[in-house]
A protein has these predicted regions:
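A short, hydrophobic C-terminal helix/tail in secreted or cell-surface proteins
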Residues: 178-182
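Solvent-exposed soluble domains appended to multi-pass membrane proteins
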Residues: 1-177
C-alpha cells in the first residue's frame, strides 16, 4: 500500500501522524471502491461513513504546525464528527453539517425516511438546541462553545441535564435488560 508522510521540517518527527495520513489515504481509496460498486447496484443503498473524532497525536505536533499550543477551540474541533452520508438514490444534500456522534443515528434514520425511535426523535429535537455535545464541551445553536466546566445558560442547562438523565437510562437499560436470547 502507498504511504503518505510529512515532509520538510516535520519529516521523520511524527510517526503516528505519518501512519494516520497513510491510513486516511488507504481508507479513501477503499471508500471510493465501495461507492463505485454500490453506484451500480439497483437496490436502494445508503452508506454512512464517520469518524468519532480526530486522532490523538503528540501535542507538540500541533504546536509545530500552528506555531502555538492547541487551545480549547482546537480541542473542540478535533472532537467533531466528520461524516459522509451517500446514497445511490436522491437524498437531501447538505454541507457543513456539524454534529456530535450521539445525533448520527437520528440523522441517518431521517435521511433514509425510516421511522425513528422515541429516543431518536428526542435527539433530533435536542440537536436544534445543542448541535454538539462531547467530552470537551457543548456548542449551542448560536455557535457558542461552553467548556465542560463552564456554566450553561439556564435553558441549555435544563436540556443537557434532561439528555444526561435519558442517556443514563438508555445505557442502563441497554446493559441491564435481558437479551432476546435469555
Amino acid at each position: 500500500p502507498r504511504e503518505v508522510w510529512l515532509t520538510g521540517a516535520l519529516e521523520g518527527r511524527f510517526n503516528t501522524v505519518n501512519q494516520y495520513l497513510s491510513l486516511v489515504y488507504q481508507s479513501d481509496q477503499a471508500f471510493e471502491y465501495l461507492l463505485d460498486y454500490f453506484s451500480q447496484v439497483e437496490e436502494p443503498t445508503l452508506i454512512l461513513l464517520f469518524g468519532d473524532h480526530q486522532p490523538q497525536v503528540a501535542t507538540n505536533f500541533y504546536t509545530d504546525v500552528l506555531g502555538t499550543a492547541p487551545d480549547t477551540a482546537l480541542a473542540q474541533k478535533k472532537q467533531m464528527v466528520p461524516f459522509v452520508l451517500w446514497a445511490n438514490y436522491d437524498i437531501p444534500e447538505a454541507q457543513g453539517v456539524e454534529l456530535s456522534l450521539n445525533y448520527l443515528s437520528a440523522l441517518l434514520m431521517d435521511t433514509a425516511n425510516l421511522p425513528m425511535t422515541g429516543y431518536q426523535k428526542y435527539l433530533a429535537r435536542l440537536w436544534e438546541a445543542a448541535p454538539v455535545i462531547n467530552t470537551v464541551g457543548i456548542r449551542d445553536a448560536g455557535g457558542n462553545w461552553y467548556g465542560e466546566n463552564e456554566a450553561l445558560p439556564e435553558e441549555l442547562e435544563a436540556a443537557v441535564e434532561d439528555y444526561r438523565v435519558l442517556l443514563y437510562n438508555h445505557v442502563c437499560l441497554l446493559y441491564t435488560s435481558p437479551s432476546p436470547r435469555d
